[in-house]
């Protein structure tokens, strides 16, 4: 399996990679980006649950501290441009003997920050493609009014408040996956 061998970033292994360097201004907007081929060596294998307690005590400017800072700045950038990211619960398969169970859990903040880094890289790549007049970009149009009306009805049926002054993007960001009635809004 490539993801566990030649294409993985296992600790102490040298692997070819595309390395992105993306500079941001103080509010998280991209000021420059470049990509280059390089050989990289991963120093350690991390997981979301393991780094979550470390982030709180991470030294300023460290990779983990920057993950939080940049993630939060990019979430604010997303909201400012009217973008939405659904607060989907994480799904995990639990195997006990011959029994398989699908379990759901609330996403950790670090998972959302990491997703913002991926989106940031995608935006940088898209800007390069637009500038170079190459590639195919996928964008989504605003939702149709009838789709928003259906969503209002669904929220009301689930007992989820949607104040009249709250915009569609703000509402989409508001469901709490920890509340039993809210996850169906993401489906």
Label every model-predicted segment.
Residues 1-187:
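Electropositive polyanion-binding surfaces
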């Amino acid at each position: 399996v490539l993801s566990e061998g030649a294409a993985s970033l296992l600790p102490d292994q040298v692997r070819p990679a595309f390395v992105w360097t993306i500079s941001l201004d103080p509010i998280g907007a991209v000021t420059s980006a470049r990509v280059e081929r390089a050989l990289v060596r991963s120093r350690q294998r991390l997981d979301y649950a393991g780094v979550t307690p470390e982030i709180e005590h991470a030294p300023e400017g460290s990779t983990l501290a920057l993950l939080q800072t940049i993630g939060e700045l990019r979430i604010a950038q997303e909201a400012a441009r009217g973008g939405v990211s659904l607060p989907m619960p994480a799904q995990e398969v639990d195997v006990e003997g011959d029994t398989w169970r699908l379990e759901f859990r609330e996403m950790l903040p670090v998972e959302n920050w990491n997703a913002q880094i991926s989106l940031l890289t995608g935006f940088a790549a898209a800007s390069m493609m637009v500038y170079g007049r190459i590639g195919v970009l996928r964008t989504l149009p605003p939702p149709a009014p009838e789709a928003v009306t259906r969503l209002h009805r669904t929220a009301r049926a689930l007992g989820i408040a949607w104040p009249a002054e709250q915009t569609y993007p703000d509402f989409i960001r508001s469901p709490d996956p920890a509340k039993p009635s809210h996850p169906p809004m993401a489906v």
